[in-house]
């Protein structure tokens, strides 16, 4: 059976990360870390990825922990917004 989607729920991804750069206006860089198991050696390894995120009101500072959500493309590299 298919589950019906509740009204107001979105299927956009939400990630949590740390702000690492705030040099540009209305733009921040967020580093998202996750733990994955290495395919061959079976050791748990920390993977990191940086996302360019739209910060409409320039509220975020370096070191802040923020939640980001997928969004339609805002520029060539920005596809995430701060929630």
UniProtKB/Swiss-Prot annotation:
The keyword S-adenosyl-L-methionine does not apply. One of its GO terms (molecular function) is structural constituent of ribosome. Transmembrane segments: none annotated. CDD domains: Ribosomal_uS17. Pfam families: Ribosomal_S17 (PF00366). GO terms for biological process: translation. Keywords: Ribonucleoprotein, Ribosomal protein, RNA-binding, rRNA-binding. The keyword Ribosomal protein applies. One of its GO terms (cellular component) is cytosolic small ribosomal subunit. NCBIfam families: PRK05610.1, uS17_bact. Part of the 30S ribosomal subunit. Belongs to the universal ribosomal protein uS17 family. This is Small ribosomal subunit protein uS17. The gene is rpsQ.
């Amino acid at each position: 059976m298919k589950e019906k989607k509740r009204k107001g729920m979105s299927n956009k991804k939400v990630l949590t990360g740390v702000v690492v750069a705030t040099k540009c206006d209305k733009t921040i860089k967020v580093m998202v870390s996750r733990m994955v198991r290495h395919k061959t050696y079976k050791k748990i390894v920390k993977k990191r990825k940086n996302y360019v995120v739209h910060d409409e009101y320039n509220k975020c500072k370096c070191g802040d922990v923020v939640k980001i959500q997928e969004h339609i493309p805002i520029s060539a590299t920005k596809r995430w917004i701060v929630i």
